[in-house]
């Protein structure tokens, strides 16, 4: 096992490295297909680890003000038929209109979170924040760079807050 740890580090397989002792013990206890069991479990753990890290990265990148699920709002029925993949892949817009307290922000965050869970890159802006960043970019002559960074996202949420 000592030989494996540096190799796992070198390959950047942090999830495997973390769970190697536990999985080796489990494989020894079960004394089944030995190496096959160990390798299969290590690969499963690494996949789970990378998926989790990717989700956390996309959540940080999105800068959502809070985490809201669509199922947590009474207005969820309004958007339950929306397939966020189709909306994004077909470059469609969704506009949420309603009075104060009608859960527009909650629904927008819920849709953004659903997109993040499906591995899309999302960015949440308040209208004021976006306008400020655009003006700042114009003032310092880096509008093109700013727009290029915005284009990297699959979904942009602009909230009125």
Give the ranges of each region predicted by the language model.
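Conserved hydrophobic/aromatic pocket- or pore-lining residues that grip, position, or stack substrates
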Residues: 73, 108, 126
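Short glycine-rich substrate-engagement loop in P-loop NTPases that contacts/grips substrate
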Residues: 76-82, 91, 122-152
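Interdomain "pre-motor" coupling segment immediately N-terminal to P-loop NTPase/helicase cores
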Residues: 5, 9, 13-65
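Conserved catalytic network of the ASCE P-loop NTPase/AAA+ motor domain
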Residues: 86-89, 115-117, 148-151, 156
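Pre-Walker A (pre-P-loop) alpha-helix and adjacent loop at the N terminus of AAA/AAA+ ATPase modules
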Residues: 57, 62-94
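Post-Walker A helix-loop "phosphate-sensing" segment adjacent to the P-loop in P-loop NTPases
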Residues: 112-125
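Walker B catalytic acidic pair
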Residues: 160-161
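Walker A/P-loop nucleotide-binding motif
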Residues: 91-107
């Amino acid at each position: 096992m000592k030989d494996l740890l540096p190799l796992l580090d070198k390959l950047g397989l942090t999830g495997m490295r973390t769970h190697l002792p536990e999985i080796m013990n489990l494989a020894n206890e079960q004394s089944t297909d030995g190496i096959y069991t160990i390798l299969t479990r290590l690969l499963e753990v690494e996949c789970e680890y990378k998926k989790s890290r990717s989700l956390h990265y996309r959540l940080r990148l999105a800068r959502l003000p809070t985490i809201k699920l669509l199922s947590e709002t009474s207005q969820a029925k309004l958007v339950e038929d929306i397939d966020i993949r189709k909306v994004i892949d077909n470059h469609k817009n969704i506009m949420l209109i309603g009075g104060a307290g009608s859960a527009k922000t909650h629904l927008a965050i819920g849709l953004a979170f659903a997109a993040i869970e499906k591995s899309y890159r999302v960015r949440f802006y308040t209208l004021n924040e976006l306008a400020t960043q655009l003006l700042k970019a114009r003032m310092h002559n880096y509008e093109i760079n700013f727009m290029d960074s915005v284009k990297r996202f699959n979904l942009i949420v602009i909230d009125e807050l």
